[in-house]
Amino acid sequence: YDADALEEEGIEPPKTWEELKSAAEKLTTKDRYGIVLPVEKTAYTLFNWWPFMWMDDADIYDADGNVTAGKDSMADALDFWGPFYQNEYCPSSLQSGPWSIDNIANGVAAMQIGGTYMINAAEEYNKDGHNIGVVPLPSPKGKDPVTVAGGQMMAVSSQSKDVDAAADFIFWCFGSDDTTYVTKWCTEAKFAYPARQSVIEENKELFQEGMKAIFTEFYDTARPEPQYSSEVTDIMGDTLQ
């Protein structure tokens, strides 16, 4: 969020859904949107949606595999999500992607849903005089915050002409006893939590610097990004539209 914009309006960083909606409304002006949310029917939009669904005790299936998407809790979560678009608190299109902190730095919006992939760029902007802050996703009043954890993987195709060389590269970068390269990848090339707990343990101080410390603090509230069939994601994508 743009800390200066919130301070000018006398708004504290939101902690609850109602505070988030109120802040988005107050921060929306003729020159700036209150918040950036993804608008297109994409996997990234669903990635942003899952925590809001979970925080209202909604889900696609229950533990026994029964469909629960039609329950009231899902409707309540959708009713919260929809007005941000309907009331034009967020833009209907973006020059920068919804995953880019440029939307805050360039004054497109005062708040944005984002993740660890924004940290390095946000801290560079702050060095240049911006005042970008971060807080956990707001949650319904009286309920615990939840976020979503995604990730990226490298794999080698069995059809590759250089299977052994490609596999050697992956292990050199991410699986070696020398953790120099995986540490640089996770903290300099981008910011992400490595799958290897040993890498985190060896670099505790790096994960407690600046904005990283805030993400590390609520790391345990993350749930893995769910993997559903294309039929399910297509229906959910249409529902959000």
Q: Where on the chain are the PLM-derived regions?
A:
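Periplasmic solute-binding protein
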Residues: Y1-P13, P38-A63, V148-V156, V232-L240
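Short helices/loops that flank or line small-molecule/ion binding pockets
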Residues: A5-L6, E25-K26, P98-Q112, D238
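A local structural motif
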Residues: E8-P13, A63-N66, G82-S96, V108, ...
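Short helix-initiation/N-cap motifs at beta->coil->alpha
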Residues: K15-S22, S92-N106
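Extracytoplasmic/periplasmic solute-binding protein
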Residues: E18-V67, G82, A109
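Glycine-centered hinge/linker elements that transmit conformational signals in sensory
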Residues: A23-T28, D64-L94, L137
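Paired acidic/hydrophobic, glycine-rich loop segments that form the ligand-binding mouth/hinge
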Residues: A110-G115, G133
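C-terminal lobe and pocket-closing loops
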Residues: Y117-G129, P140-D238
